[in-house]
Amino acid sequence: MDFLWTWLPFLLVSILAQFILAPIIVRFTSSHPACPEFEAAGIGQLPPDVAANLGRFVYAMNAEGFVLVGYFRQLAYMRNVGFYLALLKHPVHADTVYAMEMFANNGIVPVRSAHVEFCTDFTDGKEICTNNSKQPSVHKAHPGMRVHRFPEAQNPHLLYAIHRRLCANLAPGVAHVPMADGMEVFHLSYGTVKDVRKQAEFGYYYLDEKGNVFRPTLKGACRITWRLAWPIGAMRRSRMRKNARATMLSLGF
């Protein structure tokens, strides 16, 4: 009983911080640009470690038939958040892929993360995306965009094979829509904010026209923070890994 009373205050503070204070902070400080702008950059303009990582990725994807569109950077996508990425497209299969290195500075410890995502648009208006992000989405799923996460598929060749198999199984016989030449930067900008626009239709974000940014509603802020908070976040990550393994097995991997 003494043990319980010792730890009870810490538990209550944790619950208060994660489920009450965090949504309020996110509600009033978080934003997504409504029209994000991406700056093209040469590989020599990237930080050396980022350039090395993205360069290896481009070389690996060249072997799969992808061609490089370019390297891009967005150093102020959200408050204290920016990223670098390499964008490629497949001239035959009409697939696109990007490798992203994201960084965030919360004022205490700089945070870095990276993931790869393959995307295919179809003539019926749907989109299938396959990535290896280690974090489950905090957004509401919608039928127009099917996003599959395989956090243990860190080999880009394996991830692309999974993506191709998913496209064949989920959209058999439906033609792919290629990324138009000269529209790559627009496609990148629109694709970045497309899901946020959809979330706004669900009531999780609203457009702040003065700042030209999307901001979370209180409902959206609660959804974002609660789905990441412990122990919910840990359970969702565990379930995501389990589902990913089951899907890979069903696809023959």
PLM regions with names:
Residues 21-86:
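N-terminal topogenic membrane-targeting module
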